[in-house]
Structures are given as structure tokens and as C-alpha cells.
């Protein structure tokens, strides 16, 4: 600390650091922590500079969860409910659909279970195809950059 001066009957000193340049009472000079110098030291050591890893682009069309057999049934039921009960509330349709599902036998439910399994297989196939396509695109991109060098 340097530059002691008299101000309001107290003696102050300025911090020698260019970025800090604060006035500090001489009695408290030893207690002064110069955060500007502290941050520069950390930056010189590599702290505070965050490098972001490259993220692979995610496919927004990818289904996060597959449909259950009940969901497949409700999708089918809603289509028929709209035509049969024109003007009824959606809430009523959900209640009626749930009551119908509970009253169905296991054999009737099995059809919807099979449809749900088929849709899940189709979803997995499309996800695999899209993953293969994106891998091929990345490989082509790498080859192009290698050819440029």
C-alpha cells in the first residue's frame, strides 16, 4: 500500500493493485484483501475458465417413454368417443374410458398390449436408424475436415 494522505483527520492508503485502487485506513492495511489480485491469480492458474464439452445433438423427435397398453386403448377410445358422444367433455370421456378398461377381460386387454409392444419396437427401430444416420453424418464431417488439412 502506498500514497498515504490525510483525509478527515485519518490517514488512508491506496491499494497498489491497479484494478482495486481502494482507499484503506492505514490501521487496516494489513487486513485488506485485494480481490482483484486474488481473481487474477486464480485465472492465471486456470480456475474460473470453464471449457464446455461438445454435446452431441439430441433428436427432439425421439420418444422418451413408450406407450402402455392402457395409453394405446385410451388413444383408440378417444377417437371413437369423439364421434359417438359429440359435445361431451373430455373429462367424462376419460372417466368412461377408465371404467371400460377396468371392466375388460385380460384377453381383450391383450390386443392393446400387443399393439403397445409393436409401437415400442417401431420406436426403437426409428431411434436406431436416426442414431446410425447421425453417426454417418459425423463420420463424413470428420473425413471432410481431414481432407481439408
UniProtKB/Swiss-Prot annotation:
Stretches the record annotates as Disordered: 111-149
Entry keyword DNA-binding: yes
Instruction: Give the InterPro entries listed for this entry.
Output: HMG_box_dom, HMG_box_dom_sf
Keywords on this record? DNA-binding, Nucleus
Report the SMART domains cross-referenced here.
Answer: HMG (SM00398)
Keyword Protease present in the record's keywords: the answer is: no
**Recorded GO CC terms:** nucleus
* Gene Ontology molecular function: any one: DNA binding
Q: Where in the cell is it found?
A: Nucleus
Q: Where is the composition biased (Acidic residues)?
A: 117-149
Q: Which residues bind DNA?
A: 63-131
Xref: CDD domains: HMG-box_AtHMGB1-like
Pfam families per UniProt:
HMG_box
Domain of life of the source: Eukaryota
Q: To which protein family does this belong?
A: Belongs to the HMGB family.
Protein name (Swiss-Prot/TrEMBL): High mobility group B protein 12
Origin species = Arabidopsis thaliana
Amino acid at each position: 500500500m502506498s500514497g498515504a494522505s490525510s483525509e478527515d483527520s485519518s490517514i488512508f492508503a491506496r491499494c497498489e493493485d491497479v484494478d482495486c485502487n481502494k482507499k484503506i485506513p492505514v490501521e487496516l492495511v494489513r487486513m485488506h484483501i485485494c480481490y482483484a489480485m486474488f481473481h487474477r491469480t486464480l485465472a492465471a492458474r486456470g480456475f474460473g475458465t470453464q471449457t464446455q464439452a461438445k454435446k452431441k445433438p439430441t433428436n427432439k423427435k425421439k420418444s422418451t417413454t413408450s406407450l402402455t397398453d392402457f395409453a394405446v386403448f385410451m388413444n383408440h377410445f378417444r377417437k371413437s368417443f369423439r364421434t359417438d358422444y359429440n359435445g361431451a367433455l373430455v373429462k367424462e370421456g376419460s372417466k368412461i374410458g377408465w371404467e371400460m378398461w377396468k371392466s375388460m377381460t385380460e384377453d381383450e386387454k391383450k390386443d392393446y398390449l400387443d399393439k403397445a409392444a409393436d409401437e415400442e419396437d417401431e420406436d426403437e427401430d426409428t431411434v436406431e436408424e436416426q442414431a446410425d444416420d447421425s453417426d454417418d453424418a459425423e463420420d463424413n464431417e470428420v473425413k471432410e475436415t481431414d481432407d481439408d488439412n
